[in-house]
Amino acid sequence: MTNIRKSHPLMKIINNTFIDLPTPSNISSWWNFGSLLGICLILQILTGLFLAMHYTPDTMTAFSSVTHICRDVNYGWIIRYLHANGASMFFICLFIHVGRGLYYGSYMFLETWNIGVILLFTVMATAFMGYVLPWGQMSFWGATVITNLLSAIPYIGTDLVEWIWGGFSVDKATLTRFFAFHFILPFIITALATVHLLFLHETGSNNPTGISSDMDKIPFHPYYTIKDILGALLMIMALLILVLFSPDLLGDPDNYTPANPLNTPPHIKPEWYFLFAYAILRSIPNKLGGVLALVASILILILMPMLHTSKQRSMMFRPLSQCLFWVLVADLVTLTWIGGQPVEHPFIIIGQLASILYFSIILVLMPITSIIENSLLKL
């Protein structure tokens, strides 16, 4: 008799995805972050659902409804902080996941990579809209500043911004629609993640060497299920330490002041995970140029397969490219720091240099370095 796990239409899908999946025997802990992202997504949907039961998307009551969740709802405070800091965990895992893809050449799986870039954009949009919902000062002014960037689009810009706002400023209509989108987008992300996984399983996983591992595969269960559970426990532990000991560490104190359109905070800045892109935006004095650079800083990922000039897929055996990769990581950390600083000397020039370096490494230095490494192979 055939095992039900392999014959039942639903069980068969689960079996081929999480149990009998042939997996390279040498994938390292850097491959754990896909499953961690899945766990983050489930956590965000569940905590978000319970928050939505008590939240009111109205300018008059939004701020007090969040306060009510923290003060009066049973364990509301932990649900709220798990959701807020869960977003930070989500982005930490996302950045590592993308970085792993860049380092080991996973972008050569075109469909998987492109859907991943779409997922990144969608998650960023969802997080931005979620930040607006508590209706604190930084929520309101962040929404005003970021949506206003669309006014840089020639001819249709102003109309587009007012259409998104649902009026002549960020107001009740904006908050209501942001709540609606923030609620629906995680389910779209889940669907996209399923397609992401579907395309990945068409080709099989990459591995640290970047060489085909068809002759050396092991079943996903029990080896990688155990490994993923360990990764999940470590991540949940880190998240709980953050939530229970310093829940406001990554937030902005300004967001504990109710939104006031008549009073602008001294430094308007988004959440920490957008600061690198915000720094690139601010480093260009022209509004349209800044917006284009902001979009390009993420969209550049789509070009990675075309910029790959090396004969080797992975950076594992390419020390020069490795150095450049870690310079890129340091550059992104620098941009994140600059994004949170006021617009004054010396931060302006540091931000401009870091932005130039970011695009130079990806578009110029990495392809040239790969060509040099190719020639070194012949020696």
Curated annotation (Swiss-Prot):
Disulfide bonds: none annotated. One of its GO terms (molecular function) is metal ion binding. It comes from Babyrousa babyrussa. Its cofactor is heme b. A ubiquinone binds at residue 201. The cytochrome bc1 complex contains 11 subunits: 3 respiratory subunits (MT-CYB, CYC1 and UQCRFS1), 2 core proteins (UQCRC1 and UQCRC2) and 6 low-molecular weight proteins (UQCRH/QCR6, UQCRB/QCR7, UQCRQ/QCR8, UQCR10/QCR9, UQCR11/QCR10 and a cleavage product of UQCRFS1). This cytochrome bc1 complex then forms a dimer. Heme b b566 binds at residues 97, 196. The keyword Electron transport applies. One of its GO terms (cellular component) is mitochondrial inner membrane. One of its GO terms (biological process) is mitochondrial electron transport, ubiquinol to cytochrome c. The gene is MT-CYB. SUPFAM superfamilies: a domain/subunit of cytochrome bc1 complex (Ubiquinol-cytochrome c reductase), Transmembrane di-heme cytochromes. It holds the Pfam family Cytochrome_B. Component of the ubiquinol-cytochrome c reductase complex (complex III or cytochrome b-c1 complex) that is part of the mitochondrial respiratory chain. The b-c1 complex mediates electron transfer from ubiquinol to cytochrome c. Contributes to the generation of a proton gradient across the mitochondrial membrane that is then used for ATP synthesis. This is Cytochrome b. The chain crosses the membrane at residues 33-53, 77-98, 113-133, 178-198, 226-246, 288-308, 320-340, 347-367. It is a multi-pass membrane protein. Belongs to the cytochrome b family. Binds 2 heme b groups non-covalently. It is found in: Mitochondrion inner membrane. Heme 1 (or BL or b562) is low-potential and absorbs at about 562 nm, and heme 2 (or BH or b566) is high-potential and absorbs at about 566 nm. The keyword Disulfide bond does not apply. Heme b b562 binds at residues 83, 182. Keywords: Electron transport, Heme, Iron, Membrane, Metal-binding, Mitochondrion, Mitochondrion inner membrane, Respiratory chain, Transmembrane, Transmembrane helix, Transport, Ubiquinone.
